[in-house]
Amino acid sequence: MGALLNALRQAWASDLGVQWENHFLLDTTPVIAVGYRRDKHHSDFLGSAAYGYCAARRMKYFGYKLAMLTTLDGMPYAFELLPANADERAAADEILDSLPPNSYVWSDKGFIGDEWQAQWAETGRHIWTTKRENQLSQNPPAFDQLLNCVRERVEGAFDILKEGGRSVEHTLAHTIEGLCSRTLAKISGVTLRLYLRRFLGIDVLTYTITA
């Protein structure tokens, strides 16, 4: 079922022209597997999930980290589930290879690393982030303003995954297979929403059809 759903998602994305994109948004979001204080010894997630911390939410949790690339319109391009304690850049490494050469990736401070960014730039994947205040080299103010605007798009793309029933952060799944299936379904739903709006003029949030 998962393979069929993913094939449909890729077909919708192709119809939407994802193959012509070269600007992408990169971020991660927590995916909770089991309550933080609940016993994990008999959980199906033991051995693959991990304890982690989401700085943006100031939240400790047990589960996974969803790393995802989207287009500027918020269409999912590539994604990967990793243990919650995975480094942001290690998570990104799992999906950046899927990008075509001469791609530009907009991300946040969690992905700062001059050497790491330079290594990816050599492959034609250019990663842009804001700078920390203590870094010697700083971006031009106008560029940081642009990055902040793009960051709002990143947050918007992930907010869609958290809407409605079975948020990607709380899938309520009891098995690894179930969690992966529900995560894929949620991501595919975002692509389908964009597809219906583009080709049929249907807004699935309001159930209205535009002329």
Which positions does each model-derived feature cover?
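Short alpha-helical elements
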Residues: 1-211
